[in-house]
Every structure is written in C-alpha cells, then in structure tokens.
C-alpha cells in the first residue's frame, strides 16, 4: 500500500506534458460555440499556440479558445516597437476571435548606420536592444546591442539597410571582382594572399595557359600527331629560308651562314652530310646544293621545344585577347533579345524608305557607270585615232608637210594662207638646209584642248545627272490662297504646295501640325485649336473638313490635314494607294446605266475591271453616241455618278469648287478643272477615263438641262460670319476687347463671360477663353476644362477646381492677346458654372486619416474623410457627439460648414498613419578645394555621405579615350566666332569620351570630356499584395450530433468552408450523443502566411532619362534629356539621334529588396503558380479545397486537424528570375524599377563654345600660377587639383605632369583664374605635385588621404568604378597589359630601388648587342659582299672595254 502511495505521489509531482512549448502566458481567451484547432507558430520574437478547452453548461457544450505566447526575445520591448507597414520584425498577432495574422513592426530606438569603406563592412550602433535587417544582394537580420558589423562580399552590393526606425538604400562596389576572393577564402589561404592572387589573376591565367599549351605540345612532339602543326611552321620555315639564302653572309670555310661563335657544322641546310668543311664549301659553291629545305626545317620545328614554347605563348595571348574575363560576367545575367517592334521609330521609317532610296541609288549607279564606260571608250578611241580627233582643230597640209590651225584658215587651191608655218611654231627654211618633220609636239596643244573640252562636258553631264534626282515641281502657295476672297481652281487641295514630304509627319498629332504651321506663319494662333481638334483618322478628318462652311476655314483645315498626310494626293499619280480606296470602291459598287446596256464598251470595262482604260475615250462617240438622246433622266443619273466619284476622290475644297461650278452652271470651268486634274495625274488611268467621260457628257445637248444632285448644295460655302452665333443681330457687344489684358496670379473671377473671336487668318471661331472683370478693360483667361465653381464666401466670385479659390486662372499668351486685339470678338454667357450649395458642405465626418498638408502655398491641417474627400480642420480630436463613434468635427463644436478641397491642391502630407520612409545616399558638392580637403581628411569612413569636388564631379573614374574633333563656327581674322563641336555618344551609363578640339588648320586648342553620368529606363510600380509560405492555418469548427450539415456555413471574409457528414459513431461522439452514421463536422479555415514576397504592378509608362555632362578645365555642366524633347540651351544642343525602346515587366515581385520577374498572378487571380495566396489590407485571400481529418475521443468532442486549406504554390516563386540589370528604389507603397545597363540609343550633341580667338593666342605666356591638390593614391576618387592662374592674354596651354592628367590642354583666359584638374597617380609624388602649364612650372601643394578604401558607395542610378573598368578593359590581355607587366617588373624595381634605370639600361644593352651580333652583322656582311661583287663586275667590264 505504501508503494502504491509513493508511486501515486511521484506521478502527481511530475509535470504535465504540453504540446509546442512549456509555460507561456495566456494572451487572449474567447469562449465560443466554435472551436479552434491547435496551432503552434514562431515569429521573430516569440512562439504562440492556440488550443480549445471544452466546457459544458445547461445550454450546451462550448469551447474556451485560448492563445498562449512564450517570448523568445524577452527584452524586445526595450527597443520601443511600433507597428508600421513594411517593417522588418514579423509578429503574429491574435484577433478577438483568436484568428492569427502577421503584422510588421520596427524598433523606435535610435540606430546609427554607417559603412566602413576600408574593411567593406556595414557598421550598426545603438544604445539599447535593437533589430536590423540587410536586404538585397545579401540577406541578414538579427538582434544586437551596442555595435555590430556585417561584412560585404559581393562585387557590387545593392542594399537596403534597416536598423531601428531608419532605412537607407545604396549601391556599393569593390575595386576588384570579389568572386575570386570569395572562392579562395574558402581555402586555407590567408586573406592577404587571396587578395594578391586575385589582383594578378590575369597574368597567372596567362602563364598557366601558356604552360598547359607548352606541355600539350611537348607531349604531342613525341608522336606523329605533332605534324598536324606543319601548316603553321612551313610558312615560317619558308620565309626563314628566303632570308637565309639571300640576306645572310656566308662562312668562308663551310659556305653556310656566318656563325662567329660556333664551329662549322657537318649538315648542310639541304639535308646533306659532309665530314669536312671543305667538302661542304664545295657542295655549296658548286651549285649542287638545292637550297634551304623548308619542309625539313618545319618537321624539325614540330619536334623542337623552342618553337613549341613560342607557339604556346602566342596561342595563349591570342586566346586571352578575344576572351572576356569570367569575373565580369554576371551569373544568370539575362541576355537581350531584340524584337522588330522594339526597334526605334526612325529605323522603321528608314525601312519604309529604303526601297525608294535603293531604286534611286541603282539608277544613279547605272548612269554613273554608263558615263564612265563611255568615257573609257572615247579615251581608247582617242588614243588610237588621235589625228582624227585633232583634225577638228588643225589640218594636215600635204603640200608643205605641216599642220595648220583651222581658225582663220583660207585655201588657195592646194595651198593655204598658213603654209610654211606649222602649229608647233616652226617655219620652212628658205635655204632648204633644214626640213620640217612632223612630231608629237605639232598637235600637243590641240590634244590637250580636246581633252579639256571632253572633261568639261563630262562634268556637266554628271552634274545634270545628280541634279535630276532632286528636281521637284512646285504648286500654289497656301498663304496666297488665304488672301483670295473666293475659291479658285489652283487653291484646291490637289494643287496646293506642300513642300518636302516626310513620312514621319503621319505620326505627328494635329496639335504638332498646328505648331509647325504657326512657326511657318501660315496660320494664326487663333487657328490652332481648330486644327488640333481634327480627328486622327483620315475618314474623320475628311468629314471634319467638309463640315466647315466657309472657304478659308475649310482650306486651313484641309491644308493641315495634307501637311500631315503629305503624300495623300501624290498617291493619285499611280493606279493604287490608300487615298484612292474610297472612290474606286464607290465606282465598283455602282453601275452606269449606259454600261448595263453596253457592258463591253471600253469605258465600262475600265470602270468595272480596270482594263481598256487607255482606249475608253475613243468609243464614246461610237457605241454610246445615241444612248442618251432623249433620255434626260439616264443622262442625269450617269453624270451625277461620275461627279460623285470625283467627290469621293477629291474631298474638301475640290468638292466645294465643283459644287460652286455646278450651282453657277459654269460647265466650261468645270471641264477645265477636271482637265487640270487629269494633267496633274496623267498616270491614273481610271481617273483619266472618268474625266474624259465627264467631258464627253458635257458635249451632249442634254447638258443644258442637267440637274445635279441636291447633295452638292450642302457643299456650297456660306458667307463668313460677322457676329458671334450666340448673339442676336440687334445686340451690340458691351466688352471692349481692344484693351484686353491677361493678368497673372488671379484666383477669382467676377462677371465671368465666354468670349468668341474670329481668326484674322481663316475666320474660324475661337472660343477657348473667358473674360472677367470690368467690360471696359476686361481680363481674359484660358477656358477651364472643368468649368468654374461659385465661391462659398462671395456668391459673385468664381473659382477653379473647388469653391476655395486656391488655383490661378491660366493666363493667355501675349501672342494670343495680340491676335485677340486684332480680331472681331463678342462676349456670351458662360454656361459651365457650378453653383455653391449648402448641402455640398459638411460639419463632421468619419475620419479616415489626418495630418498636415501643403495646400496651394499654405500648410493646412487636413482631414481625409471616409468618402475620400479632404476638408480643412483645425481640430482633429473633437468628436461629434451627435454621430456614430469615429466621427470628428471639422470645426470647434461642429459649428461651421466646411466644403471639400480638390485633391490636386493637396500635396506633401504627413499623415498620422505610420508610413515608412527610406533614405538615400547624400551627395555633397563642395566648391572650395580647402573645404573638400577637410571633408575627405576627417576619415568619415563610416559616413553614408559622399563628398564631391564640384568642378570635377562630372568626370568619369577612368581617363577616357580621346579623339580629335575639328571646331566649327564662323571663321574670322581672330579665330572662330560662335564656335561649337558636334559629336555622337552612346546613351549608356558610364560611357565617356574625350575630345581634343583642334582648329581647321590642325592646331590643338583644348580638351573637353563628355560623360554619360546616368542613363536609365524606369517605371513606378504600386503594391498589389503580399504572399508567402503557409506557416499555419486558422480554423473554426463545430459539430452536430445528428442531422445533416448546414446548407450555408457561416464564415469570415476570405475563409474557406469544409464539412463532412456521418461522423457520429460508437466511440466517436461527445458525451450524451447517441448516434450511429449520423451527424456532421463542419467549419472554416484560412491560411496564415509569412509575408516574404510583395507583388507590384506597373502604373506608369517607361521613362527614359539620361544625364549628359561636359567638363572643361574651368567649368562643368550637365543636362537631362529624354527621347521626346530635344534640349536647346546657351551651352548645349542635345537630342536623341536613335532611340532604343525597352519594356519593363507589367508585374514584378520584391523579396528582400531584390526584383524578381516571371509568371506572377495579378491581384484577384488565383491560378496555379506564384501568388495564388494574396494578403490584401490584412486579409488573406485564396482558393482551394480544404483537406481535414479528425480524431475521435470517447465521450468528448472530436479533435479536427486541417491539413490543407488554401492552394498555396509559393514554391513556384523560387523559380522567378532576378534580372542583373535591374535596380530598385523603394518608397512608401510604391517602388521604382530602374534598368541601368541598357544602351538607350545614340545621343547627338552640339556643345556651344562661344568665341575662340585662337589666332591671337600667344606661344609664350607669362603667368603667375599656384595650385592646391588633395585626394588619394590608388583609390576611387584619385586626386583633384585647383589651379589659380593669372595672365593678361589668352592662350592654349599644354599640361604636363608626372601623373596622368585627365585634361592634356586647357584654354587660359584673363577673365578666368580658377581651373580644376583630375589627376591619377600610381605612386606618391611627394609633398608637392609638379604640373607644367605653358612652360610655367607649378609646385601644387598636395594633401593625401592615408585611407585605402576598397568599397565605393554610389547612388542607385549611377555607375561605379569597377563597371567603367570592365567596359574599358574587356579581355584578359587588356588586364595583363594594365596590371600584369607592372607586376612582372615590380620585384626588380623593389630590388634595385632608384638604380632601376641603370638595370633596365644594362638589360636593354645586352639584348641590343645580341641582336646586332646575330641579326644585324650577318645582314651587313652580306650587303658588303654583294656590293663588292658589283664592284668586281664593274672592273671586269671596264677591262673588256
């Protein structure tokens, strides 16, 4: 018994087992009919579990649902957490119904964020417990106290660092690629050795590859496979054989090539072997030796290690010259695929024009070659028959055997008046001692004359040929037609002069067309609204034109339409074209009565089938001669059909002119006009047939009784209006618009009236303005699109946008004012007035948010109500006791009615709802060099601020490659006035180019550096939802002992329901339930997700932004440009020449400050894949079929286990891609996605230089100079210098320094004294830096920073040093050239110190001596022997003579 008691005591003393965790505190209880399932979850600070404890009373069985939390970070409250959107501390909260959901928090305790650039570590410091998160290319988070460091190891880190309430995003890059360092850090090598190896990895690769190739060739030389290299060595051996036989001195003893340091050999170069040198010499001298055997030498080279070693070095160099380093290739980088639709618009336009240009080029090419061939044939004929060609200018006289000039020649029988005198100038000798002989000189000047005339004719033919390409006919000028009062035939559309036709005009909106016409002074500014309202489609534009009732208005609208579609009537020159579709279809769908009877008549066949059009005129008088006789109705119908076809072909003024001629019965003028059209378009066969048919119909007698269609009366012009349509004829205008003004900063308007004016150019009604104020001196403003609002304070005053009069009325330009003063104007009642009513205002509302906002120019307290309207409220804590809870008074005691404020007036609000803000890198531009020195010498290595010297801030990291460019402008006696340079530069971030500006004579004037500081394509994205993996399932369930499941199961928003019937059975039922195969278990569930991925959707179109900078020695300036608007300033003229268009993805996902793209569900779409569970405004949505099970307990309720609720395919999100070229800027609720690695096009730049009087520059300049430099050695920023130069003359000065200077030549003027230079030094030059300017030596003081930063910080949209270095040096051999050779020579430099020059001289002398002995001396001796042979041969020849 005692044992039993002891066992019972021990059992009672042991702790009761609890699931998930022991202990914990109850945070919430909720007795309910529905029970929750057991859930155990962990967040960043605690663990939490829920369980159901059943209780029973008189009313039934209930569940006491309990939530228990156990803290893992017990002191996390010390950091003063606060709930915030986008926080980095995930905490699971318990709802009133014990449903679990995740919320985000941040700590309020202050935290200092810094970056140590020398150790590449992020430094975080705080005074209490705090939490940090680093997201981006690396992801780390945790709790800390005091100070912690996080090491960066990626080559370029794009990070968002969050600590406490602070968040900052920045871009940081190392000075070398870190993939090699990270790899070697995993081995036993120390960090310093790993860094040294990676810094010289290129030369290590070169040496290793050379050795591998050499070993491979050495192994192959042991086999016959080595002879595969024969094609490589045969040309070398053959070339060596030629040099051996012809260029080298021979040994006197053996006859082989001169060998001063070795004995005579036994093997000849031909392969023969001799025991003695005498036999060898006899073999060589007797001519028995066939010469150097190249094939034998090539075989020896294939087996030899010497050629193998040389070949291995050459092969390694060639391989590494064309291979990109592995380090500069980003793993997983997306490759660009260019689609045709993404090509620039100008390239598409070029594709449309290429066929025409190709035809012109072919014709020009054929004619040019034809002229060349003809010229060559004539040249050959001239060479063979010169005398016959020369006979045009001179004749041969057989009597005196001389040539005589034909000019002034007279014949006397067989003699002439020029006998005894030749064209060469020789006279016949009277004594007969000397006889004249015909020579080449007799006709040489006539041959030259003929050739000169031929060349002149040839050049004239070439000029005529090239000029014929650009010949263009002229039409009637538009401005001339506007001056005519009535319409004329030459002022209709087909005959208007449209100038040069460019097809890109079709893409211009009519607003731009109006601006162009206004710039050409073709229209008035009052005509522009009418032109801008022309419909964009052609059919709508033609209808719009025909609706105009006066000649000048219709002509103006038609001219604008033809200016856009400038080839509209040019299409009529042929038998097809987009502008001919309507009238040709109209003819095909209508039949002439005559053609029904005579379908084979040529005219009918032309109209219906398009054939026999050329002969349609010939049989009008044959088959159709008597058809219309006595048939006036058929005559009228057919002629109206032909005229209607002309109407569909020539709309607008042409149709109006035809209607005018018909109404006047001016048949002759009508026929004359149609003939003009036929002459204008002679190649249009169908149009010619219609015109001829109309002319034939006019010749018939029925024409006198012709009744044209009533349709033509609608096309007749009406008289131009002299009063506004809204005014009666008897009323007179009361406003004096001759004194009209348009005052600025007017927020209220009294006596508002609408104004109608007639354009002085076209007479069109202009009603885009309103008038305010006194009728004797009214003010006019642009008519508002939303009307005007009556002020709530003054009923006679009107405002814009709302009733508070916060917005200025838009003023009218001075150009429009001048036009209004010259025009006829009337006032009218303004109809769009919104009256102020008391019911529009409220005294209180349910507040949605509150804060202080910028309203116009003021800072007002604003309340946003539940109806999303904004109101002024000086009190934001006064409840309205007459309303429901949550209503706040807008005024003290709800005494004043407040009216809504237009949202566009509200900006920059500080709402009370917590919203996170993310800071960026601060860039400070310092103008003074001394202040810059102080800023960088304070060792603020942990600061997240960048300090830039203002005068050199726009220079690249690496000195650019220079190109020579000639200065342009107006040349004068002193130099160039209005000088400028033009160039092109790719729109790629980090691209730089140097310009060495020269005069037209080639004189170097100055250096300028162009730098694309940033180039990006970006879009703004708004948040849709968050998603993540399922960490648990919220469940509510109940059960019925008997009966079916409920038809409708109550559930909360976003919850899914489940049910299962026949769950009651023996041993599986609650206490008191006696049922078998009956009852039901039912409930609802919802996933608890951990917020890991946020999905955003694109809200704005892609914005292309490029910042281009030019830097001189004394100034620097930048401009931002986009592909749409060219930039024209006093310093710059910049525009995109070509534009590459890119499209950013519509939906992106953000995880840990990293962009992911791919197949992601949109908001409200729950298809299989990433994002099919969505958390929106704290509610989780999804779909699926819940899977659940239950455990039976004897006489107790069932334990429900929900195994799956939503279909969550979050695993698919892991397959999303992370584009390497995308960068991210986060903001409250939105993100900006930036693509910064694309070439956005080509920028055409024109830099204005002003007057450059280089011809007056002095060669010897007397100046006083001093300088100050500061910076660092082998770092990112290098050294910046400020020079103070004083001189009295202008000069172009070269700059020479022991270090690399970015500008090699500067322009010095008396008016400018401060000049800035950027210098790169690889070694410390001393306490001063020597710079020579125009032979003036400047010892600039030098203050160097000892810090050696290995990490560079940069704003998100700018490039870093490592990327510019990769772009400049893309191959391994380039890296070897920049670093490897220096590394090879570095040990010798350290060994010899200052005597390195003597060592280099000694080595070079030895190499030169060896070259002289083995190469130069044999060649010289061979040359000496050759000269001696020639001397001996000369002496032998002299003896023979």
From Swiss-Prot:
Topology feature Lumenal, residues = 14-200, 327-365, 474-1395
Write out the entry's keywords from A to Z.
Answer: Fusion of virus membrane with host endosomal membrane, Fusion of virus membrane with host membrane, Glycoprotein, Host endoplasmic reticulum, Host Golgi apparatus, Host membrane, Host-virus interaction, Membrane, Signal, Transmembrane, Transmembrane helix, Viral attachment to host cell, Viral penetration into host cytoplasm, Virion, Virus entry into host cell
Extract the signal peptide range. 1-13
Q: At what residues does the UniProt record annotate the site feature described as Cleavage?
A: 473-474
The UniProt similarity line reads:
Belongs to the orthobunyavirus envelope glycoprotein family.
Cell cycle among the record's keywords? Answer: no
Identify this protein by name.
Envelopment polyprotein
